[in-house]
Amino acid sequence: MISAAIGSRLNLMDGTMEGVPTTKRYLGDLKGCFADERAHALALTRGNPLLYSVASVESAQGDGQLHYGLGMLMPGRVGREYFMTRGHYHAWRAAAEVYVGLRGEGFMLLED
């Protein structure tokens, strides 16, 4: 059976995937994620910018199925901290996860 996910289109120029749901997270969505909560509150008085977006393709159910997505992290800081994602936990701890930088410069700090 061929999954509808195969029909998704990846656009490397603008970092989008056509035809899949996209989640957007703004500064206000990450309350409690930054170490300097005062800097976060101050930054919110200047606006509620987009911090990151994730386009996700849901896989078929069952062992060996691949769930994949395309995340785009925006440049910027809150106080002395760079923009970040909220993060997530895997229900199945042994799940593999791969990150590939497509464009730009930066660091990924991952927690296990």
Predicted regions and their residues:
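Eukaryotic intrinsically disordered, low-complexity regions enriched in proline/serine/threonine/glycine
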Residues: 1-33
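Active-site region of the double-stranded beta-helix
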Residues: 21-112
